[in-house]
From Swiss-Prot:
Heme b b566 binds at residues 97, 196. It comes from Chaetodipus baileyi (Bailey's pocket mouse). Binds 2 heme b groups non-covalently. Component of the ubiquinol-cytochrome c reductase complex (complex III or cytochrome b-c1 complex) that is part of the mitochondrial respiratory chain. The b-c1 complex mediates electron transfer from ubiquinol to cytochrome c. Contributes to the generation of a proton gradient across the mitochondrial membrane that is then used for ATP synthesis. Signal peptide: none annotated. Belongs to the cytochrome b family. This is Cytochrome b. It holds the Pfam family Cytochrom_B_C. GO terms for cellular component: mitochondrial inner membrane; respiratory chain complex III. The chain crosses the membrane at residues 33-53, 77-98, 113-133, 178-198, 226-246, 288-308, 320-340, 347-367. The cytochrome bc1 complex contains 11 subunits: 3 respiratory subunits (MT-CYB, CYC1 and UQCRFS1), 2 core proteins (UQCRC1 and UQCRC2) and 6 low-molecular weight proteins (UQCRH/QCR6, UQCRB/QCR7, UQCRQ/QCR8, UQCR10/QCR9, UQCR11/QCR10 and a cleavage product of UQCRFS1). This cytochrome bc1 complex then forms a dimer. It is a multi-pass membrane protein. It is found in: Mitochondrion inner membrane. A ubiquinone binds at residue 201.
Amino acid sequence: MTITRKSHPLMKMINHAFIDLPAPSNISSWWNFGSLLGLCLMIQIASGLFLAMHYTSDTLTAFSSVAHICRDVNYGWLIRYIHANGASLFFVCLYLHIGRGIYYGSYMYKETWNIGIILLFLTMATAFMGYVLPWGQMSFWGATVITNLLSAIPYVGTNLVEWIWGGFSVDKATLTRFFAFHFILPFIIAAMAMVHLLFLHETGSNNPLGIPSNSDKIPFHPYYTTKDLLGIFILLAFFLTFVLFFPDLLGDPDNYSPANPLNTPPHIKPEWYFLFAYAILRSIPNKLGGVIALVLSILILALFPLLHTANQRSMMFRPISQILFWTLVSDLMILTWIGGQPVEPPFIVIGQVASILYFSIILILMPVAGLIENKLIKW
């Protein structure tokens, strides 16, 4: 008689995905971030659901409903801060996951990689709309500035912006629809994550060496279930410490003032996880050019499989590519810093140089480094 987990239609799927899945024996802790992202998504959906029970998506009551959650709802302050900082945790894991993919050449699984890029766009859209919901000053002005970027699209731009707003400015209609989309998108993200896994399990995981590991596989359970659990506990310990001791560290003080269309904050900026893209947007004086650069800064990830010139998949034994990779990481940190600074010298020039370097490393230097390393191997 077959074991239930191998014969039952539903259990069989779970078994193939999480129990009897053949996994490479040498994948490091960098491969933990997939499961950690799943955990982040579950935390966000659960905390968001409880927040939605008390939140009202009306311009007159949105701000006070958030205050009500923090003051009057049992542990409402905790749920609110878990949700707000959970978004930051989500993006930390997301960026580390993407960085791992770039370093070890995981982008060569094109379908998995492209679904991942779609997931990134969906997550960014969800986070942006969620930031608008508390209806504070930065919520309102962030929504106004970012949606206004679409007006740079020739011919249809203005109509498109007014269509998204549901009027001639960011108002009640905008807030209501943003709440509706913010609620539904995480479930779409969850569905896309399943597709992401489906494509991954077609090929199997990559590994640090970037070579086929079919000759040396181990079952996912108990080895990697235990390893994932360790990662989950470490992450939760760090996360809860952060939420309970520094809940407002990453937030903007302006968002504790109710939205006022008549008073513009001195520095309008998004949350920290969008600052690198915001810096690239601001580094181009032309509005349409800036918007194109902003979209390309993320969409450029789709070019990685096409720009891979090296004979080796992973960067583990490619020193020149390693230097370029860590330069890219440093460059992104500089862009993140610049995105939070006012538009004045010397920040303007630093932002422009960092933006040029960002695109140069990915489009020119990395492919050239791959070709040089191919030659070095033959010497």
